[in-house]
Each structure stands twice: as C-alpha cells, then as structure tokens.
Amino acid sequence: MRSYDQYCSIARALDVTGDRWTLLIVRELLLQGPCRFTDLKRGLPGIATNLLSARLKELESAALVTREDAPPPVATALYELTESGRALEPALKALALWGLRFMGEERADDAFQARWLAYAPAWFTTDADPDAPPAVIQLIAAGELAVIELGDGQVRTRLGRAADPDLVLDGPPRAVLGLLTGVVDLERAGHLGLSATGATGLLARLRPAVSDPAPARGEARSQPRRA
C-alpha cells in the first residue's frame, strides 16, 4: 500500500482505505458481521482471490480487521472488524448518502445482492409517522428478498420473506431502491418496472434522509416522491 506522504488526516485515512475494494470489504463486514473468506468473496462479485487476500492482510496490518481461527465444526478463519474498523460506519453512511446522486442509472452488468437492498431503508430513511401502528413492507428486487419493519418510530430491516406484509414492492433494483431513497417517485418507479401491492400509503412514512438528492452533472433532478 503506497502512502500519500502528507501530514493530513484525509490523506492518512486514504492511505489505509483508499485502495480499490477496501471500503467494499468494510461494507460487507459491517453488513454481514464476522465472515469466512468465502462469504466475503461471494459478497464482492468481481474481486480476484489473491486481491481479496492482499486487501485483508492490509486491513489486518492497519488494525481495522482481525482474523480468528474458529473451532470445529466451522474450522475456518473468521474476519471481523475491530473497533477502529467499525468506526468507519458513519463515514460509509455519509459516502453512501452522497452516492445516491449517481444511482439514476442501473448498468446491465451491475451485480446486486439482498444485503445492499436491506441496508438502504435503515440508513437512508426515517419514520415520518412514529406514532402510527407497526407495519411491514416486503421488498423484492432482482429476486432478492428483504423486509422493512416500521414501529416505535424506528425503521428496521432484515433479509428474507415477511409472513403477512402490508405492502409488497417488487421490481428491478433501480426502481425499488430509487423509490425507497427518494431518487424516484412512485409513478416513475412504476415506469421502471415496479409493482406495488397493498397499502401504498405506507410509503409516505418512509421519509428520505435527503428528500431530493442533488443529481450528478448531466442528470435531471427527480420529482419528490408521492404515494
């Protein structure tokens, strides 16, 4: 890992985290918790085995990740973020929020996984009606399943299928994530292939952290979401 050789905290942070794939490895460890090497590789489509090994060693050297040999029946090494590694979560959340402006287009070769669907509502939305009754929203995007649970003023998410959801949102990732994060409204999401079944009024409870993300240069500004 090369250094910028600058006495600046931004440069020092990039010395540790600025290489390609490094922050995505941190993302996976934040979302999955302690991981086997194979779990990490599965969560990082496109990374070469030797590169993942190198990045993990660099993160270990920087004291952001620990490697522990798990006892049988697991009998494999588990990678886990240290306290310093977990301290990157607010920075990743801020970076993810800033990155919404570049989510207007979904490229044909973009990979997608359920974990990336599940974290978005918890990170990017708040409950606009915290005194309302609990509600459950089932998300289905590119065949990946996640659940939003609203209650007690909290927005919680998990992977999997809900037993009796109040609302089901099913469509391509761009439509589902775009709607949840306020990048597109319900009408536009429908044009993008979203199917909404059930109490669509629940969407009004999901207040985006940024109601109208600033578009990247050359992109049109979306209209506020309306349920």
Can you annotate each of these PLM segments?
Residues 8-47:
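N-terminal helix-turn-helix DNA-binding core of bacterial DNA-binding proteins
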Residues 18, 71-94:
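Basic, amphipathic "hinge/linker" alpha-helix immediately C-terminal to the N-terminal HTH DNA-binding motif
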Residues 55:
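Residues within the DNA-recognition helix of helix-turn-helix
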Residues 58:
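Alpha-helical DNA-recognition elements
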Residues 64-65:
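Short hydrophobic beta-strand motif reused across regulatory alpha/beta modules
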Residues 84-150, 200-227:
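Acidic, aliphatic-rich amphipathic alpha-helical segments
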Residues 162-227:
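C-terminal interaction segments
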